[in-house]
């Protein structure tokens, strides 16, 4: 009887893993040009399955994310204006980290050009919380995870290995760009497989929401929503612009 219970438990655990993880990656121990199309079909199916199970419980943050990802919701917009041969898919991280601060921050003392005012005194456990949300999937969208990114990086090469950087597989890189955006990090050894603008983090205080955005693989800014009369109002001009 115990053996049967153990077997059933293992089967349930495996079923949960298959349903919730990127189980399709096990089909592709080595990504090649021949199986790349199938890989993207499975990746798209995985992303759609995540969308179908997402529980939305923070309408304000969802609205903020949707507004900043609006360009990717428009049919046919899979690249920045001016680029030729846009890729087939948009790619966004599966999770966006949200830092929640249960207090007001001083938006006067801390000038907007310095970005979100992190210089708070030591906070108690009940004054902040860090969690994450799954953003809305854009038009022709795919969710990127660290495992999927690793698979793609192996396919195109150019990764850092100690003090050396692997040779880039230019043939694989060319075909991959037909499917998704691909940018090489300017320090070398890593890739960006995401669409831009890209939300990297959200800081949510009682009177301020700061959305940290990468506008490209080498530039970024923050968008502020300041609370006025019990409503968060978007500041038209971005704050805290930076260049790497």
Where are the language model's segments positioned?
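Intrinsically disordered, low-complexity segments enriched in glycine/proline and serine/threonine
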Residues: 5-7, 14, 62, 86, ...
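Flexible low-complexity loop/turn motifs enriched in small/helix-breaking residues
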Residues: 22-208
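His-enriched metal-coordination microenvironments in redox/metal-binding proteins
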Residues: 203, 214-220, 242-244
């Amino acid at each position: 009887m115990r053996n049967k219970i153990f077997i059933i438990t293992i089967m349930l655990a495996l079923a949960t893993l298959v349903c919730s993880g990127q189980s399709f990656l096990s089909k592709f121990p080595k990504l090649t040009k021949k199986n790349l199309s199938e890989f993207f079909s499975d990746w798209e199916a995985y992303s759609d399955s995540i969308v179908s199970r997402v529980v939305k419980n923070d309408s304000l943050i969802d609205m903020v994310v949707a507004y900043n990802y609006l360009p990717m919701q428009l049919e046919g917009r899979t690249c920045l204006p001016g680029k030729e041969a846009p890729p087939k898919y948009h790619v966004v991280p599966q999770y966006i980290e949200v830092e929640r601060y249960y207090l007001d921050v001083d938006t006067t003392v801390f000038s907007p050009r310095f970005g979100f005012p992190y210089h708070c005194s030591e906070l108690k456990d009940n004054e902040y919380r860090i969690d994450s949300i799954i953003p809305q999937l854009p038009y022709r969208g795919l969710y990127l995870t660290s495992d999927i990114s690793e698979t793609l990086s192996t396919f195109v090469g150019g990764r850092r290995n100690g003090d050396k950087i692997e040779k880039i597989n230019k043939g694989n890189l060319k075909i991959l760009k037909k499917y998704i955006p691909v940018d090489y990090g300017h320090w070398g050894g890593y890739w960006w497989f995401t669409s831009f603008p890209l939300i990297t983090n959200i800081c949510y205080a009682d009177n301020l929401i700061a959305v940290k955005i990468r506008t490209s693989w080498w530039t970024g800014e923050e968008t502020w929503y300041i609370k006025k009369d019990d409503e968060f109002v978007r500041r038209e001009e971005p704050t805290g612009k930076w260049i790497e």
